[in-house]
Amino acid sequence: MDKDAKNLTALEAERELEWLAKEIARHDVLYNNHDQPEISDARYDALRRRNIEIETLFPELVRADSPSYKVGAPISERFEKSVHAQAMLSLDNAFSSEDVHEFVERVRRFLRLPVTKTLEMTAEPKIDGLSLSLRYEKGKLVCAATRGDGYVGENVTVNARTLSDIPQVLQGDFPDILEVRGEVYMRHSDFQDLNVDQQEKGKLVFANPRNAAAGSLRQLDTRMTARRKLKFFAYGWGEVSEMPAKSQMEMVKKLKEYGFVINPLTKVFKAVEDLISYYHFIEEGRQHLDYDIDGVVYKVNDLLLQTRLGNVSRSPRWAIAHKFPAEKAMALLENIDIQIGRTGALTPVARLAPITVGGVVVTNASLHNEDYIKGLGSKSESIREGRDIRIGDTVIVQRAGDVIPQIIDVIIEKRPKGASPFVFPSLCPACGSHAVREVGEAVRRCTGGLICPAQAIERIRHFVSRNAFDIEGLGEKQVEFFFHAQDETLRIHSPADIFTLQKRQEKSLTRLENMEGFGTLSVRKLYDAINARRKIPLSRFLFALGIRHVGEVNARRLARAYQNYNAFETVAMTALMPCNKEDKGNEEWLELTSIEGIGVRVGKAIIDFYQETHNRDVLSSLLQEVTPLPEEAAVADYSPVAGKTIVFTGTLVHMSRDEVKALAERLGAKASSSISKKTDLLVAGIGAGSKLTKAKELGIEIMDEESWLQLINEHHI
């Protein structure tokens, strides 16, 4: 991450995105499920920001497991699952005043607000705690759930009822259904008392109030939660049967009327400069607060504008978190490990003696590639004044972002005698194949391909992962066990092997039930979990295949566009890419690449995947065992445009082009940029030209912008 993203080559960007996706996912699990973060929030934010920056510059390289489309982490198995009626999204981050100005300008452009139009924003401290959603029906608390992965959380209702800040019954005139979102936290004074008590009882102390709050709320013993003096600030909402307010601030005040505690520092401002001043005011005064904060959150105050702005994959367009600066610390570099990714990339990871930076325990840091270790940048320029990194060094670690921390320098004066330069392996540690670094690349890659167990195992892990086939009982350790099994009736080397496991076992004398870590009950549950996935939504199926650049979002786009697998496969097998500048490719190619978000790079990756004989063989075997189901509608049945392909052309007056496309997609339609026989509707603005003419020739339904808005409004959307 030392190199400016703008100067990255496509290959360098691809390698770094691979590392970011894996590390961010690992730390999401540590933070959300185990309450044991290894890095600071600032470091976590920096990595997420780096990921978004690279994806923005290289949209064609967005990965199937991109953290940009994920919120939180898959939930643990300690609590029952609770599905959020509305997704609990995360927030994009700002790290400077310039970022805040850009955010406000971005909002104005999306809404087409003139400079003279005032844009009110709320500002509030960003509480460093555990996000919680509280569902009330007829004024009574019926469910409390953690964020989880943003869509499904942990049901902690019994524990939440012990918090004095959470009303069991709402006060005043409240909606029939109300989901309140907020943050569970622990005051500094209560945190200190808790750790004193832990020490006296000979128990482990907590690293910081956030960990203590999260661990306390997720206790299996409710009495333990009740003793921990947890607090709750309400700041938002999810599903509401009837909105009682027109602005963010008005709604927050309503929450107070209902009986919730709101942060008294929440304010409304009309100018960006006032937001920045408020940020510095809070930053300077944070030491006097009795709870942890890690920034300031800005939100568009007008709820109608919030609705128009909508959301992107993992965050709302109408809010942003302005984070406080990073912190630094010295750490001892104990070792350097080499990890092998699904695509064969060799990634060095620093193992550090545990240190605490800003209350967060740090044990790992990325070393990016061999040049970075040598003290060289992406263009072979000197970094860190040429100081290389060696095992045994004392290094400067900066917490400023996402997944693992960043090593920014080496303390040469503390280098032990005899410390030798690190020799990057030229052979893959997993399979012994040559690790080749091609010209212009920063990363070495294993050439073992399918014979490399590390790569093959990662592919299977991806296939069974939470957002793909989501097969319970096939975690990392189990996948490794089955992959390395000596008995062929236990071996899993391809996706189809998963679904033939039970049949092979029925004819075997080597019983899985007798293996260490398994038993009759666990094996039965595993088979049930596997058989439950023999029918799966098309989007999950496509994502599970691991086609480069086809992440969760693109998989959903493809599934929505083609509805069934046969239609998708036909296009993937018959699409012909342009062979020269004059050639535009055949109709299937144009159809594929005209899907919103699916461009030339993604289309090429899909075609390349299906042209590979091995991939077709794997798919053929897999399709004998599983059935991809037509994609379910992403919106309610009453959406007038659900499932339709819409093209917008000409100049639109009331909404920006981005806004109408985003609205169409939220309503279950596919926004396309080109007219074809499969187009259902053309919305024509002022000055519509050739697309309007072609639509008339093809007999496609046409309406103007006013009719489009009327259609939407008639259905209360």
UniProtKB/Swiss-Prot annotation:
CDD domains (alphabetical): BRCT_DNA_ligase_like, LIGANc
Enzyme type, top EC level: ligase
GO molecular-function term, one example from the UniProt record: DNA ligase (NAD+) activity
Catalytic function, reaction form: NAD(+) + (deoxyribonucleotide)n-3'-hydroxyl + 5'-phospho-(deoxyribonucleotide)m = (deoxyribonucleotide)n+m + AMP + beta-nicotinamide D-nucleotide
Cofactor field: Mg(2+); Mn(2+)
Keywords: DNA damage, DNA repair, DNA replication, Ligase, Magnesium, Manganese, Metal-binding, NAD, Zinc
Keyword presence, Metal-binding: yes
Gene Ontology CC: cytosol
Binding locations of NAD(+): D41, A42, R43, Y44, D45, S90, L91, E124, R147, E183, K299, K323
One Pfam family recorded for the sequence: DNA_ligase_aden
Sequence ranges assigned to domain BRCT in this UniProt record: 636-717
GO BP annotations listed: DNA repair; DNA replication
This enzyme's EC code(s): 6.5.1.2
Catalytic site: K126 (n6-amp-lysine intermediate)
Coiled coil (residue ranges): none
Residues that bind Zn(2+): C428, C431, C446, C452
Family: Belongs to the NAD-dependent DNA ligase family. LigA subfamily.
Record function comment: DNA ligase that catalyzes the formation of phosphodiester linkages between 5'-phosphoryl and 3'-hydroxyl groups in double-stranded DNA using NAD as a coenzyme and as the energy source for the reaction. It is essential for DNA replication and repair of damaged DNA.
HAMAP family per UniProt: DNA_ligase_A
Database matches in NCBIfam families: dnlj, PRK07956.1
UniProt name for this protein: DNA ligase
Lineage: Bacteria, Pseudomonadati, Pseudomonadota, Alphaproteobacteria, Hyphomicrobiales
